[in-house]
Amino acid sequence: MAVSRAPAPDSACQRMVWLFPLVFCLGSGSEVSQSSSDPQLMNGVLGESAVLPLKLPAGKIANIIIWNYEWEASQVTALVINLSNPESPQIMNTDVKKRLNITQSYSLQISNLTMADTGSYTAQITTKDSEVITFKYILRVFERLGNLETTNYTLLLENGTCQIHLACVLKNQSQTVSVEWQATGNISLGGPNVTIFWDPRNSGDQTYVCRAKNAVSNLSVSVSTQSLCKGVLTNPPWNAVWFMTTISIISAVILIFVCWSIHVWKRRGSLPLTSQHPESSQSTDGPGSPGNTVYAQVTRPMQEMKIPKPIKNDSMTIYSIVNHSREETVALTGYNQPITLKVNTLINYNS
């Protein structure tokens, strides 16, 4: 689109001289004026261009157009267009950065938008019949959305239902942005963080969409319940894994303890015979115990009794075998073998 622009004045004096007839014309106009009731809302993208459209009323011929913008609660003139000679309009541009231009319809074009360009703008038109018409605009500058990410956490409940926590995050955004989750059919779930439950036995795969949007752009990311719950459905729940792990650890500890006890018992040997056979202490004194010979001397009672005639070699020998434990045997002999002690009991019969 072609842009018509007048040469810039060479000095401040020439600029004042050039503006004087314009001010005179504006001052001598009639008191009749009209303006748009509500400002026209315009949206621009950061770093791109925005156009504030200007449309003259039907049957009206513009003589002077002045574009103003508000800065620190005051009106600042940005562009002045003199249309006294429509074939060669004169334009004064006060923008030193040359970001302001005029289209063929005398609309205001702002290039390389910044956040500072946000604000109120007015177009003041003076017609040939000295009528003043004012158009108002509100320009908002937005940044295009980017880096939309989703996070999820799934949990398999005891009844077989998959519980899904969904979060939608828009990074590096300083402006207010609408972020929400939607179910099938564009049904809003009411926010960037939602919790849903999905039972694979009673329902098929479902899709949920996270949508983020502002005045100039929108983004969306979709997820499916089947893909989110695939991991927990194929793996046992955490509580079952914990239970199985605990049982395994306890079993291993018990097995190690039993093996250690057996090893210690084998190293110490079998239990002492005295503890295994407590009756042995009683049986060792018995005269009939095999393995030892005990000699006992028997004294005749004091009562008179008839004594038989002694016979040559009339002595009697009583053998008694006494058993000793292995430990007693080793202590007595130094050898780990049983010994047999024989004691002759002599019974003398004296007349």
Swiss-Prot record:
A motif (ITSM 2) lies at residues 317-322. Its main location: membrane. InterPro entries: CD2/SLAM_rcpt, Ig-like_dom, Ig-like_dom_sf, Ig-like_fold, Ig_V-set. The modification Phosphotyrosine is found at residue 319. It is a single-pass type I membrane protein. Changing residue 335 to F: Strong inhibitory signaling in germinal center formation (absence of SH2D1A/SAP). GO terms for biological process: adaptive immune response; innate immune response; natural killer cell differentiation; natural killer cell proliferation. Pfam families: V-set. A motif (ITSM 1) lies at residues 293-298. Self-ligand receptor of the signaling lymphocytic activation molecule (SLAM) family. SLAM receptors triggered by homo- or heterotypic cell-cell interactions are modulating the activation and differentiation of a wide variety of immune cells and thus are involved in the regulation and interconnection of both innate and adaptive immune response. Activities are controlled by presence or absence of small cytoplasmic adapter proteins, SH2D1A/SAP and/or SH2D1B/EAT-2. Triggers cytolytic activity only in natural killer cells (NK) expressing high surface densities of natural cytotoxicity receptors. This is SLAM family member 6. It comes from Mus musculus (Mouse).
